[in-house]
């Protein structure tokens, strides 16, 4: 994937530089690649103990100078609407179209907020992003996101309530709602490891920029890694327009990110 190749290039440049400059003092450096990050499985088989590091930094950020220490907390919901299919020519009084029930449910979702296209900053959202539909059964997958973990349950209760309302409007239908945890706000862990963030800030300054600390309206593998015992903030990599057809990356920002990594190695060695 392009995102993996991007990170590999950055790591290779950093490694070659450190090997070519043995005078640069640094402690042991561990390198990890999480190739399934974009589908939410990047840390499923990541062995933190074997990795053997006290902390880590993902290179998965956006604009030059950004340092991110908090992410969304995230769950996913699958709402499966069940209907009854029969031959459409003889369906009167028999057919219950699960596609229409699901459409009714989606139409009931808030239209004045709680949607990605209507929120910013620290605002959370509910986002229907995929459907698998037939008359008999239609499943709707939704993302639930907020920076405050307790708010996830509030939004999940709302989704379940709206799903039940849709079913009530279509006699003969039913619904099953399943909630799965995706990741949690890494700030809950990083607040207990201020040196991990402070050392990164110092590396930014040595590389000639003041860190811009802003929340990620999304997640990185650092979220899961932090809760697995490996505190992991996120550093910019020059990425823009994530997941869109217009995604692009700044080569200049990538090189600046490498400078930050090199400085970071030295900061940790000097402050050890």
What role is predicted for each listed range?
Residues 3, 71-73, 134:
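A generic structural micro-feature
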Residues 10, 14, 22-98:
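Fold-level recognition of mixed alpha/beta catalytic cores in primary-metabolism enzymes, strongest
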């Amino acid at each position: 994937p392009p995102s993996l190749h991007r990170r590999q290039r950055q790591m290779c440049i950093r490694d070659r530089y450190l090997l070519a400059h043995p005078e640069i003092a640094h402690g042991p450096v561990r390198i990890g690649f999480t190739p399934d990050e974009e589908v939410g499985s990047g840390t499923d088989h990541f062995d933190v103990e074997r990795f053997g590091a006290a902390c880590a930094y993902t290179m998965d950020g956006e604009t030059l100078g950004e340092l991110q220490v908090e992410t969304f907390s995230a769950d996913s919901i699958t709402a499966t609407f069940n209907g009854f299919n029969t031959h459409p020519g003889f369906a009167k009084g028999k057919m219950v179209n699960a596609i229409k029930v699901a459409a009714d449910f989606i139409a009931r979702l808030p239209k004045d907020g709680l949607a990605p296209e209507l929120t910013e900053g620290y605002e959370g959202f509910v986002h229907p992003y995929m459907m698998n539909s037939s008359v008999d059964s239609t499943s709707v997958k939704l993302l639930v996101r907020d920076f405050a973990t307790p708010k996830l349950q509030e939004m999940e209760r709302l989704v379940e309530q709206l799903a039940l309302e849709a079913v009530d409007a279509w006699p003969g239908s039913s619904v099953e709602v399943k909630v799965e945890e995706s990741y949690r706000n890494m700030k809950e862990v990083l607040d207990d490891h201020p040196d991990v963030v402070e050392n990164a800030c110092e590396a930014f300054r040595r590389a000639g920029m003041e860190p811009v600390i802003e929340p990620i309206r999304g997640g990185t593998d650092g979220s899961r890694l932090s809760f697995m015992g490996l505190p992991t903030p996120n550093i910019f990599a020059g990425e823009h327009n994530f997941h869109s057809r217009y995604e692009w990356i700044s080569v200049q920002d990538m090189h600046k990110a490498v400078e930050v990594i090199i400085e970071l190695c030295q900061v940790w060695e000097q402050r050890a």
